[in-house]
């Protein structure tokens, strides 16, 4: 069974995935979609910072992440939107975030 902290982190990653889906699939602006989510969820400051880093980081590194994922996925554009965002989030955490253990990023992406 997961402990309370792991459940909170997983919730933040889930929120990041939803915000990114709004950005990439629906054409929402990242800052607007993120602000709405932060306002609705009333997260603790640490979780707000983590969510913000995930969303802006994936958006900023988008082409690089798609290239990296594309080395393992035949055509990322044909991948289901939720799966595509999970892969981007996982790759971003593994390759761009120093403080997130690769095992944690991989575990939550799967």
Language-model features: locations:
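Class I Rossmann-like S-adenosyl-L-methionine
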Residues: 1-110
